[in-house]
Design a protein with these regions (language model features):
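Long, positively charged amphipathic alpha-helical accessory segments at protein N-termini or as interdomain linkers
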Residues: 1-5, 15-160
């Protein structure tokens, strides 16, 4: 479609600078090991949004101008999930995803505002480290490691 798509760190999928998908994960420890629960919300064929989020949220239908088959979409997502999951099972390592994730990181190289409850700050998003934390180069020359559980990141001129 020629639309700009990517990932807004850490877990939003954006299309034309608007959020169309959010992904949440929850980690649980059991006697048998770790369990990760993944939840994904995708705005597929939504045609309107409340006024307060209209500028930052959209749907696949609104951005592409086409009705999207939910069934075909979930089949495609699960196909890719299975491929990546099998690779993880074989290696017990997710580092193979880092380069691909970074190539799709829409705020990489851009000025961001980190809404840290202790003290908000601004800097340039440099990418992610091996733990998936966002690395931000601050104006004072320091580099900060941003943990997704602590803060919210916004673009200087809007959501992205």
């Amino acid at each position: 479609t020629g639309a700009e798509s990517g990932i807004k760190w850490p877990n939003d999928i954006v299309l034309n600078s608007k959020k169309i998908c959010g992904i949440l994960t929850e980690l649980h420890f059991t006697e048998r090991g770790c369990v990760v629960i993944v939840g994904t919300g995708i705005n597929v064929n939504t045609e309107s949004f409340p006024e307060e989020i209209k500028g930052i949220a959209s749907s696949l239908k609104l951005e592409t101008g086409k009705e999207v088959s939910r069934e075909a979409l979930i089949v495609s997502i699960m196909k890719y999930f299975e491929v990546y999951y099998e690779k993880y099972v074989q290696t017990e390592d997710l580092s193979f995803l880092r380069e691909q994730y970074e190539s799709m990181l829409i705020n990489k190289g851009k000025k961001v505002r980190v809404l840290d409850p202790k003290a908000p700050y601004e800097g340039i998003a440099r990418g992610i480290n091996v733990q998936g934390n966002l690395m931000v180069a601050c104006e004072d020359g320091t580099e900060k490691c941003v943990d997704s559980g602590e803060v919210s990141v916004r673009g200087l001129y809007g959501y992205v």
